């Protein structure tokens, strides 16, 4: 974008120039892309509700667990094992937890009658000893239950362990009971109350419907909106067995997903429940499998404080609430439409890729000559020429050369390094199509002798014999009319150029060269055409006419204005023009790069 230099530059608008190609194949490709993209954009707009402004849910959760369990516990009293029956209600097997979680006890181990005194440690690899030297007074092992006294005492039979100051007797290391003591907790139910709020949309609701049947139980298909869940059903949904998990405990996630459409015409805001096991199922390889913790019941007996230590195994239920609430918003709709408009450009990118590929030199040289089916693709070269304009960087070394006996133009973009320009190969570029509209503006003198149909001047010229080489003609001259350059030695190679690549007649002998380049009447007409009030005095007439003749030849032989700016005139043409419109002092500066 050009810089603004004045106030009028502010009130401008720029747009791209496009090329319209009338092609059944490319038209079909374009509409195929547009239909696919339009279908996808509409589908995503409706299915994902991308026209809505969405807001994350804010929620609070409250739970109530109900159920009664009968526990058969085996205890040892006076050396005799007894089976004790007890009943556990909600207060016995639930524990208060922070956040959106609740805990249900399913198994436990008891150590009764503990009091603070000295006693031997429970025998383990760490606590076994044979003498007092194996125990360190005051040592507190993180895995131990107390502080060592430095004595090694008898635990039972021949086993000796370090004596500790702790709650005695020390808790035994033993496995959780199998089956779980509260195996009937599978039939417990939990009521989940979930209130949600979307403050941005000023909308609040909850998961309990107004006419809820309090005797309902959640079922994935038959009763998916019931907020009362049976614990065994939760594990069944995840593919786990409640009885197996109840032995050592675990962690279960209850997911509540709210996908709320708050638009009046499609209002819907109901929760969707799902379940996920959150702890490690592979208890055999876990370092600490399951879920457990300890708590104590304190009491006094004979004025001595005692406690019953209980190691609790159970299931922690984490309630995870997430979701969004969306409502129609015109800004979101405009943003979405604007972001998808660029997708329609994929058709242009793909078609441009096909045109560029099928018009490449590789296809032209290696594919089209051998593949008959691919020959219709040659039309892409025409499309490419109409679509793209190749521009060469205007370096000081850029030069264009045109030989009358070649159909193409040669581009030389390198330093000559003393070599004659006639001998430099260069790169072949197509000759631009001639625009004959400007010829209609020339004076009628140019058309004095009507050409013979089918026999252009240049074709007649190539059939003539070469002009005999003069004694002054350089070795690189092919037409016999070139003269040595007057430039210094370092720049002389730039003017060592003939109008022909191979021996033949000189272009200066053609009738068209005389009428178009050397005709003083035509050149004066062109100068006045550009500047109607131009005063052609005697001193500047030859200079203006000479440079106008240079430009006429360059435009005639090179066609493109860009090429004409970097065109090098053959020595024969340059000296013929200089002879017709000479310089008074006879010294000429030669070619100068316009950039």
UniProtKB/Swiss-Prot annotation:
GO molecular function, one term: sodium channel activity
InterPro entries documented for this protein: P2RX7_C, P2X7_purinoceptor, P2X_extracellular_dom_sf, P2X_purnocptor, P2X_RECEPTOR_CS
Record: residues binding GTP: 546-547, 550, 567, 583, 589-590
Membrane topology: Multi-pass membrane protein
Annotated function: ATP-gated nonselective transmembrane cation channel that requires high millimolar concentrations of ATP for activation. Upon ATP binding, it rapidly opens to allow the influx of small cations Na(+) and Ca(2+), and the K(+) efflux. Also has the ability to form a large pore in the cell membrane, allowing the passage of large cationic molecules. In microglia, may mediate NADPH transport across the plasma membrane. In immune cells, P2RX7 acts as a molecular sensor in pathological inflammatory states by detecting and responding to high local concentrations of extracellar ATP.
Marked site (Selectivity filter 1) residue numbers: 342
Sugar-bearing residue positions: 187, 202, 213, 241, 284
Region named C-cys anchor: 360-377
Transmembrane regions: 23-46, 329-353
Alphabetical list of PANTHER family matching this protein: P2X PURINOCEPTOR, P2X PURINOCEPTOR 7
Entry keyword set: ADP-ribosylation, ATP-binding, Cell membrane, Disulfide bond, Glycoprotein, GTP-binding, Ion channel, Ion transport, Ligand-gated ion channel, Lipoprotein, Membrane, Metal-binding, Nucleotide-binding, Palmitate, Phosphoprotein, Receptor, Sodium, Transmembrane, Transmembrane helix, Transport, Zinc
Record-listed Na(+) binding positions: 342
Gene assigned in the entry: P2RX7
Phosphotyrosine: modified positions: 343
Broad class of the protein's primary localization: membrane
Full protein name: P2X purinoceptor 7
Effect annotated for changing residue 496 to A: Results in a loss of function
Modification after translation (UniProt): Phosphorylation results in its inactivation. ADP-ribosylation at Arg-125 is necessary and sufficient to activate P2RX7 and gate the channel.
Protein localization: Cell membrane
